[in-house]
Amino acid sequence: MTQYRRVAIKNRLGMHARPAMKLFDLVNTFQSTVTLRNHEGVEAQADSVIAMLMLDSEQGSHIDIEASGCDEKEAIDAIIALFESGFDED
C-alpha cells in the first residue's frame, strides 16, 4: 500500500542543493520509489537531485510525499524526520 504524507519545509533556504543531496542519499538507502509534489502539482522523483531542485520549494511551503514499495513506511518516516530536522541546517 502506498504511503502519503505532507510536510512543511522548515529550513531557511528551502530545497536547495545541500538538502536535495541529503534527501537523495537517504532515499537511495530504501527500495521504495519516492515522489515529491509541490503546491503547484509539479512532481519530482526523489532519486533525482535536479528534479527536486525544480520543485522550487521555499521555507514555509509544503511538499507532498508519496512512497511506494516494500519498505515504504520506513522510507516515508525517515524522510519526514529529515524534513522535520530542517535538514540539520539551522
UniProtKB/Swiss-Prot annotation:
CDD domains: PTS-HPr_like. Pfam families: PTS-HPr. It comes from the Bacteria. One of its GO terms (cellular component) is cytoplasm. Its main location: cytoplasm. The keyword Cytoplasm applies. NCBIfam families: PRK10897.1, PTS_HPr_family. Belongs to the HPr family. PANTHER family: PHOSPHOCARRIER PROTEIN HPR, PHOSPHOCARRIER PROTEIN NPR. This is Phosphocarrier protein NPr.
